[in-house]
UniProtKB/Swiss-Prot annotation:
SUPFAM superfamilies: CsrA-like
GO cellular component: cytosol
Gene expressing this chain: csrA
Pfam families hit by this protein: CsrA
Lineage: Bacteria, Pseudomonadati, Thermodesulfobacteriota, Desulfovibrionia, Desulfovibrionales
Alphabetical GO biological process terms: bacterial-type flagellum organization; mRNA catabolic process; negative regulation of translational initiation; regulation of bacterial-type flagellum assembly; regulation of carbohydrate metabolic process
Example GO molecular function: mRNA 5'-UTR binding
Described purpose of this protein according to its UniProt entry: A translational regulator that binds mRNA to regulate translation initiation and/or mRNA stability. Usually binds in the 5'-UTR at or near the Shine-Dalgarno sequence preventing ribosome-binding, thus repressing translation. Its main target seems to be the major flagellin gene, while its function is anatagonized by FliW.
Subunit structure: Homodimer; the beta-strands of each monomer intercalate to form a hydrophobic core, while the alpha-helices form wings that extend away from the core.
Main location: cytoplasm
Name by which UniProt lists this protein: Translational regulator CsrA
Amino acid sequence: MLILTRRPGESLHLGDHIKITVLGVQGKQIKIGLEVPDDMQVYREEVYLRVLEQNRQALCAMDSDVLAAAKLWPKKTNE
């Protein structure tokens, strides 16, 4: 993990298209600004982890739905 020290108003760049700026610090909270391309999704970690879990659950449900649907079709016999 790269660890950097920045003061309010200072920024850092990730590649050519992402800029992170420290906007302010109050106690234990840091306010940051992100400049990212419009097509890039940005999530807070707790939201991102929740989305991943919901996607995982949806895939598991879809797998069981596919298996249930497959049981509805008669098995082919070799003729």
